[in-house]
Amino acid sequence: MESLKIYNTLAREKQTFVPIEPGRVRMYVCGMTVYDYCHVGHARVMVVFDMVQRWLRASGYDVTYVRNITDIDDKIIKRAVENGETIGALTNRFIAAMHEDADALGVQRPDREPRATEYVPQMLSMIGRLQDNGLAYQAADGDVNYAVRKFPGYGKLSGKSLEDLRAGERVAANDAKQDPLDFVLWKSAKADEPAESRWASPWGEGRPGWHIECSAMSCDLLGTHFDLHGGGADLQFPHHENEIAQSEGASGSTFVNTWMHNGFVRVNDEKMSKSLGNFFTIRDVLKVYDPEVVRFFILRSHYRSDLNYSDVHLDDARHALTRLYTALKDVPAEAQARPDWNEPHGKRFREAMHDDFNTPVAMAVLFELATEVNKTRSPALASQLAALGGVMGLLVRDPHAFLQGGVGAAADGLDAAEVEARIEARRAAKAARDFARADGIRADLLAAGIVLEDKPGGVTEWRRA
C-alpha cells in the first residue's frame, strides 16, 4: 500500500508520515477565540482538519484529535465589558454558536475540546519551567516574557533568523522587553479589568498569554512530543513559532513532528477583512447556501492553496454537488457501505488522499464514478460513490432530500408543499389535455429554480436547480 505523504511546514517538503507510536496519531489544531460568530476562515479550518482526521481514521489509525477553545484574551475581555456581561456568559454563548456552525457543516466533534480557562495551572507550571531553564523573565511592568534570543531554534518554523524577523515584523516597542520579539507568557492584571479575568500566580495576579495556552493544553492532553499540529497559515508566525519555543524550551525535546497549515480565504480575489466590508460569518453564508455545498466548496480546493470565496464559486459548487446526488438518485446504493479500496476508483481516490490530502483530485474521481453510475446504473458503483464521498463527509444524505431541499425556499419563495401542489395542478391539466397550461406550469417552476423530470407511469420528480 502507498504511504501517506504530508507537506510538513517545518521541513518545507512533503514527507512520508510515520507516527511516533505505530497505528496511533495524536493531533492538535488551534481552535477559535470565542468573542463573536465564526467566519468563513474558521469554517475552512474546521472542515479541512475534520477531513484530515476522517482520512486518518479511514486509513486505519487510532486518532486522538484535540482542538482547543480560547475563552480568555484581550478581545474577549473588551467585548464582555462593552456588552455589560460576564466573560463566561459571552464565551458560553459563542461556544454554543460555534458548535451549531460546525455541526451544520458536518464537522465531527474533536475527541477533546479544552478551554483555556480550565488549564491555567498547567500554564503556570510550564511558565515556571521556562523560568527555571533561563528562558523567561519578569519585566518591570509585571509581565512574564519569553526571551527568544535564549532559544537557539527560534525561527525554524518560519525559516527566518531573529534579524529577519525583527526587520520584517511590526513589533511594538516595549522598553520592558529585552528584545522586541520577546512575547508575553503571563500578563499582569490591570486595575480596570474584571475579576474573572485574573488568576493568582507566583508573579502576581494576571492571566496567560495566548501562545502559552496552546502549548500547555496540547502537551497536557497529547504529551510533550506528538505527531501532528495544524492551523491556518496566519498562525505560522508568531503563534506556532512561539508554541515551539515554549514547548521545547520547557521539555527539552521535540514538540511536534509534522506541522500543517491551510491557506488563506480570499473574497472575490481580495483578502477577507472587516475593513473591506467583505467579511462573512458562517451564519451569513448558510442563510443562502446549503451547508453541504459550503463543505464541498471548501474541500474542492487543496487545503494549502488560497480559497477564493465568491457567489459564483459557491453556485458552481452547488451545481457540481447536485450532479453527484443526481447520479445516486435512482440507483439503489447500499446503506453505510464501506469503500472498496481494490476497485479502480477506490485505488485512485486513496492515492489522491495519500498525496497530502489532495481533495481536488479525489473529487475528480467522484465525478468519474458518477459518470459510470449514470451509464451503468450499477448499485455496486453507486455504493462506492456514496462510500467514498462519505469519507469526506459528503453524499451522506438521501439524494431526494438534498435535491428537493435547499436553504430557505426557491427564488419565488416556493416550499416543497407548494411545488407538489403545482405538480398536481400540472398533472390535472395534462389529464384534461390542457397542454398549454401544463407547459406553462413547468416553465413557471423552472423560472423559480425547480426542475421537473417526468418518469414512466405518470410519476413526476423534481429538484432544485
UniProtKB/Swiss-Prot annotation:
The keyword Transport does not apply. It comes from the Bacteria. Its main location: cytoplasm. Zn(2+) binds at residues 30, 214, 239, 243. ATP binds at residue 274. The keyword Protein biosynthesis applies. It is found in: Cytoplasm. This is Cysteine--tRNA ligase. It comes from Ralstonia nicotianae (strain ATCC BAA-1114 / GMI1000). The lineage of its organism: Bacteria, Pseudomonadati, Pseudomonadota, Betaproteobacteria, Burkholderiales. The gene is cysS.
